[in-house]
């Protein structure tokens, strides 16, 4: 599960162009959130660009790898999932591709992992948010309305068909952000860079 190239200080090139492009849209580089941090591919770069990085990852094994991959002093890791409500959930882990692990929608209210709204977390105002949660992006944004409207960050949202979850992302997450006044700054593959 631990990417040997990352652990040895190698370059993590997966999605690097979107990371670099999106960070350039930020006016400030104080605080970044990595929502769906997984094992830290994005987190590692964000720790180089921002003074504080808050990584949210609900899967314990992934958090362990994240901490090994990104031993940065400016990183805080949170052991919860995000969603539209404060509740409990379970995750479905996909063994062939850890990046496709996702919330089991049938367990909301009864699982073993805490789910919080971003609005309820009390995090400092973010300049940047990366949001890659395998089809759960819309629900996370619903639970982050006050936070997003307050700090007005650049947001990178993954938008694609998620074959493992069966969720077809029909653009609801981006539509909601646009209804709040955000606009599309750039599209790179399945990632949309949103700003104000």
PLM regions and their residue ranges:
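Phosphate/nucleotide-binding beta-alpha loop and adjacent structural elements of enzyme active sites
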Residues: 1-196
């Amino acid at each position: 599960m631990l990417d040997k190239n990352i652990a040895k200080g190698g370059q993590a090139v997966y999605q690097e162009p979107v990371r670099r492009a999106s960070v350039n849209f930020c006016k400030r580089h104080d605080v970044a959130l990595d929502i769906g941090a997984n094992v830290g591919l994005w987190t590692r770069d964000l720790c180089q660009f921002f003074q504080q990085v808050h990584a949210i990852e609900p899967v314990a094994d992934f958090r362990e790898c994240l901490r090994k991959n990104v031993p940065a002093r400016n990183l805080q890791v949170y052991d919860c999932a995000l969603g539209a409500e404060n509740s409990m959930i379970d995750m479905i882990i996909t063994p062939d591709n850890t990046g496709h692990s996702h919330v089991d929608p049938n367990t909301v209210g009864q699982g073993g992992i805490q789910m919080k709204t971003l609005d309820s977390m009390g995090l400092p105002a973010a300049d940047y948010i990366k949001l890659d949660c395998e089809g759960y992006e819309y629900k996370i944004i619903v639970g982050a309305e006050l936070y997003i409207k307050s700090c007005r960050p650049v947001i990178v949202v993954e938008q694609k068909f998620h074959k493992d979850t069966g969720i077809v992302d029909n653009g609801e997450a981006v539509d909601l952000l646009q209804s709040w006044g955000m606009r599309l700054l750039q599209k790179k593959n399945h990632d949309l860079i949103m700003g104000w």
